[in-house]
């Protein structure tokens, strides 16, 4: 597992580059805990199965392409901000494809953080404040009903490794 303080600092730095409203205490904690639960900050490729999900936040490439095409495309200022925060060429946002994003999500930690935050930003609800609220929010909007995770496992992982 990576050094917790360093991971939090990188998350803070990336989210600050996206803007103050993306870097609240709640956002930083939710993004940090999501990565912790998804990978323990150990795995860059989905363990077992087909290795579809990538990065510490276990984001599927199609999820990033969807976020770009159906969310960021309608928020060009935010799209530019995300590209800059992730240190990515604009072409990955103007013509996104899964192959490029598979590589980006495996190798670019700033892009992983930014896309995790964008994923949560799309949710039309306030960010959770408590660990239990985070666990349910993560399950409902990140891991989803189809995912193997549970709110109880989220809380357990954060208490054990966080």
Residue ranges of model-derived segments:
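Short, charged helix-capping/linker segments at alpha-helix termini
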Residues: 17-26
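Short amphipathic alpha-helical interaction patches enriched in hydrophobic/aromatic residues
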Residues: 19, 123-124, 142
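Secretory-pathway/luminal and periplasmic proteins that interact with or process carbohydrate-rich
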Residues: 39-46, 126, 143-152
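Short secondary-structure capping/junction motifs at helix and strand boundaries
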Residues: 124-130
């Amino acid at each position: 597992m990576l050094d917790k303080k360093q991971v939090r600092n990188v998350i803070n730095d990336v989210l600050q580059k996206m803007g103050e409203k993306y870097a609240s205490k709640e956002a930083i904690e939710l993004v940090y805990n999501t990565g912790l639960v998804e990978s323990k900050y150990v795995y860059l490729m989905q363990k077992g199965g087909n290795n579809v999900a990538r990065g510490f936040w276990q984001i599927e490439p199609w999820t990033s392409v969807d976020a770009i095409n159906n969310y960021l495309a309608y928020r060009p200022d935010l799209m530019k901000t995300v590209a800059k925060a992730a240190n990515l060429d604009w072409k990955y946002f103007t013509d996104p494809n899964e192959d490029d994003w598979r590589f980006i999500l495996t190798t670019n930690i700033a892009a992983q953080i930014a896309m995790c935050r964008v994923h949560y930003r799309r949710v039309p609800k306030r960010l959770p404040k408590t660990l239990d609220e985070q666990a349910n929010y993560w399950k409902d909007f990140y891991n989803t009903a189809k995912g193997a995770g549970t709110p109880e496992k989220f809380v357990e992982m954060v208490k054990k490794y966080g």
